[in-house]
Amino acid sequence: MSFYRSWIGGRGDLVQRYTSSIRDDAEIAEEVVKVMKAHVTHLAEIGALRKEVADKIVAALEEVDPTELLRGEFEDIHEALEKWLIDKLGEDVGGWVGLARSRNDHVAAAIRLAALKKVGALREAAMRLRCALAARALEYADCPMPSFTHFQPAQVVTFGHYLLAVDELVAEFLHVLAAAEDLAKRSPLGAGPAGGVRTPVDRRRLAELAGFKDVVENTLYASGGRFFALALASAVTSFLVELSRAVDDFIRWNNPLLGYVEAPPEHVSTSSIMPHKRNLVTLEVLRARSEEAVGHYAALSGVVAKVGLGYSLDLQEATRHLWDILNIAIEGVEVLADFVEKIKFNCEKGRRDAELYYATSSDTAEERALRGVPFRKAYFELASEIREGKARLLTVDEALKRPVLGSANPEEVRKSASRRLALCRPKSF
């Protein structure tokens, strides 16, 4: 029987297993202990707890192995930790940790801190990806290929230009992620179950002790609100959705019918019956898991949407989807960074296809217009020439000399890639 419900009675193993979050709480185990240390330390600071009692509790918290707390039959890790402290120190010492706290504000704090740790890991992986993209873009600045619209050969670009497009996505994501991260840096501690606590805690000092930058002022919203989780999940899921488009491109280009990329051997597998196959399995998994993240976000937002602003156990079920989204992103971005660092692009094939499939036609029409022919007339004349096999098109290298910021002009690609590489530490790529 769980510790808190022992006074109610009615032990039920089925119900205990069904409602307990103890297995999922592995994601926040260290943060729960950290939050408890801050709580006890502050109670001693304001004189609500004798220093010698607080010292014993903090010393015990320094010793506890958070993973051990996950092995018992408890509702959650908060209950397990309090029971462990009481068993170790006695009720006259351990029994004080329940003062001026609720599982509601403490779990909200632990989730925020654990999420921030994962966001840090994701940011590091994203920066590794950015550095890889910039380095390879510089290497392939002059390597032509057709771009694709409607999955048809379109305007000629370079592989370096394509990689910088992916990098710009990652840069935008990091900007959005930072805004969502700021929400998670606000502390709910001291909010209690909903309306605050009678013990005169200094919530700003408590936030400082726990490692937060600010506080969520309204106590009801602090303990029951989950907008920070929705914001993080939304930012990361949106990024994965957009990133999966590039992942899909790489998978297509690995097909020998296109043959634009040679995937690193460690990223491919073969068939059990067709030994010629080189299946880009890492990116296939990343593509699938990006779609899974969409499902997790739908589940997270769906659960939160049906719960009043105060805490309900529904929110316990929502949190696991946040961890799934963040874990999918961290692992996936690390895999993609490794892929980009090692990929080889077939510049000869890219140039040949750009020439074969008229990827310089728009530049040719535009060039004629700049020489005095109305653009639509130049367009139709060129269309007729292409249909008749008589078109005199700009060469690939001529077409790439577009004088606009951010274009596929190799000089523009080199400047942009060099500027972005300057943000990278040498060990990052």
Swiss-Prot record:
Per the UniProt record, the source organism is Pyrobaculum arsenaticum (strain DSM 13514 / JCM 11321 / PZ6)
Q: Which domain of life is it from?
A: Archaea
- The EC designation for this entry is 4.3.2.1
In the record, the note on similarity to other proteins reads:
Belongs to the lyase 1 family. Argininosuccinate lyase subfamily.
Q: Which reactions are catalysed by this chain?
A: 2-(N(omega)-L-arginino)succinate = fumarate + L-arginine
List GO terms (cellular component aspect). cytosol
What's a Gene Ontology MF term here? argininosuccinate lyase activity
Q: Top EC class per UniProt?
A: lyase
Q: Quick check: keyword Heme in the entry?
A: no
Report the PANTHER family cross-referenced here.
Answer: ARGININOSUCCINATE LYASE (PTHR43814:SF1)
Location of the protein in the cell:
Cytoplasm
Q: Gene3D superfamilies, per this entry?
A: Fumarase/aspartase (C-terminal domain) (1.10.40.30), Fumarase/aspartase (Central domain) (1.20.200.10), Fumarase/aspartase (N-terminal domain) (1.10.275.10)
Q: Which GO terms describe its biological process?
A: arginine biosynthetic process via ornithine; L-arginine biosynthetic process
Q: Provide the protein name.
A: Argininosuccinate lyase
SUPFAM superfamilies assigned: L-aspartase-like (SSF48557)
Q: Which gene encodes it?
A: argH
**Functional pathway:** Amino-acid biosynthesis; L-arginine biosynthesis; L-arginine from L-ornithine and carbamoyl phosphate: step 3/3
Annotated keywords = Amino-acid biosynthesis, Arginine biosynthesis, Cytoplasm, Lyase
Grouped into one coarse class, the protein's main location is cytoplasm
**InterPro entries noted in UniProt:** Argininosuccinate_lyase (IPR009049), Fumarase/histidase_N (IPR024083), Fumarate_lyase_fam (IPR000362), Fumarate_lyase_N (IPR022761), L-Aspartase-like (IPR008948)
